[in-house]
Amino acid sequence: MLRTRLTNCSLWRPYYTSSLSRVPRAPPDKVLGLSEHFKKVKNVNKIDLTVGIYKDGWGKVTTFPSVAKAQKLIESHLELNKNLSYLPITGSKEFQENVMKFLFKESCPQFGPFYLAHDRISFVQTLSGTGALAVAAKFLALFISRDIWIPDPSWANHKNIFQNNGFENIYRYSYYKDGQIDIDGWIEQLKTFAYNNQQENNKNPPCIILHACCHNPTGLDPTKEQWEKIIDTIYELKMVPIVDMAYQGLESGNLLKDAYLLRLCLNVNKYPNWSNGIFLCQSFAKNMGLYGERVGSLSVITPATANNGKFNPLQQKNSLQQNIDSQLKKIVRGMYSSPPGYGSRVVNVVLSDFKLKQQWFKDVDFMVQRLHHVRQEMFDRLGWPDLVNFAQQHGMFYYTRFSPKQVEILRNNYFVYLTGDGRLSLSGVNDSNVDYLCESLEAVSKMDKLA
């Protein structure tokens, strides 16, 4: 009898389909997927120029001297070294104080202190820049808008982050055209969209992502005059700027100088009527080498007009800022509960120690000088006629403008790995591979882009 029942039960198995079978296969990540593929290749000439991680002249991922010294201090400090408890939802108080001082007093000395003194900044420690963007996206989709403008081209993960956090309409504005920044096309697109929005009586202000410096992937940044024109337009159209500052310091070698866009956005004298806030997404992955520690921050800065121009100096925080604080905490709690501790301790030690901070500034400048050297080495070796903007590009990358087919040929025939959009990570170039790399690029550049 039992055997009969078991036999009958087994008859159902071929007809039962798990609900998990509906799950489709996602495509490999456009950057990290290539890096994984690279590891399986056996060719001795292979070069990985995909991931934006700084490497030294021997191809090794290094620890900044300032970070190494901070780590030793943490190891020698028993209380810091052994503390494995949870951080608060929004991160450690020390991290908040040190990072806000760096961002809004040192990087923005003219206007930042005004916002700090009037408690107009809500701050959250996040899982690097990606986490900052994700928290910002969730907050914006819940309360402000589900429309966003992303540069074309842009970091591949931008679209993914905002799609996954509730954004319904993702538009692309023209950033790059014929080797230059397409300022006119960019502004015209935004104005046309704003006009159509007005005609449709859509009152939700669209968001817009702005790369603070070292635009990824092109490496081309607007001039100060162009930035003023862009911010004038964004504030006039009541858009919500999301400033992605992943590469502070890597444009000029000066951490403070590279915060120009943030200083411009916060200029209360120039923009007294801006109303929809600024979302600053910042990371210490690139400029402190803390890639795996996932340490960054989100700052939501609000103007006086957002609180009907009212400010009570007797209040610790105005009611609007308290509302924003509470919602950010709720989002973080539901997303990852609290941030990791070790990376923030490293940042705290570096930012709070005068000598270590000075060493950090030197570390960043040294890194940028090496990237400049690599850029110049390649510039001298390559004989391309369209290298005009090569020297104008900044940061960790060179944008080759290769077609997807050329990138594929470079990968399959020469074992040189670029991202699919033709972005090349300069820190992967060194004395041992620069000749082979340039020969490979030269050969592929002569091929028909549409071949």
Swiss-Prot record:
Q: Which gene encodes it?
A: AAT1
Q: Which organism is it from?
A: Saccharomyces cerevisiae (strain ATCC 204508 / S288c)
Q: Which UniProt keywords apply?
A: Aminotransferase, Mitochondrion, Pyridoxal phosphate, Transferase, Transit peptide
Catalysed reactions, semicolon-separated:
L-aspartate + 2-oxoglutarate = oxaloacetate + L-glutamate
Q: What else is known?
A: In eukaryotes there are cytoplasmic, mitochondrial and chloroplastic isozymes.
Protein name per Swiss-Prot or TrEMBL: Aspartate aminotransferase, mitochondrial
Its predominant location is mitochondrion
Is Cytoplasm one of the keywords?
no
| Binding, L-aspartate | G52, W155, N216, R423
Q: Which GO terms describe its biological process?
A: 2-oxoglutarate metabolic process; alpha-amino acid metabolic process; aspartate catabolic process; aspartate metabolic process; biosynthetic process; glutamate metabolic process
Report the residues modified as N6-(pyridoxal phosphate)lysine: K286
InterPro entries named among the record's database cross-references: Aminotransferase_I/II_large, Asp_trans, NHTrfase_class1_PyrdxlP-BS, PyrdxlP-dep_Trfase, PyrdxlP-dep_Trfase_major, PyrdxlP-dep_Trfase_small
EC identifiers of the protein: 2.6.1.1
State a GO cellular component annotated for this protein: mitochondrion
**GO MF annotations in UniProt:** L-aspartate:2-oxoglutarate aminotransferase activity; pyridoxal phosphate binding
| Gene3D superfamilies reported in the protein's UniProt record | Aspartate Aminotransferase, domain 1 (3.90.1150.10), Type I PLP-dependent aspartate aminotransferase-like (Major domain) (3.40.640.10)
The record ties this protein, via SUPFAM superfamilies, to:
PLP-dependent transferases
Query: What does the sequence similarity comment in the record state about its family?
Result: Belongs to the class-I pyridoxal-phosphate-dependent aminotransferase family.
Q: Where in the cell is it found?
A: Mitochondrion matrix
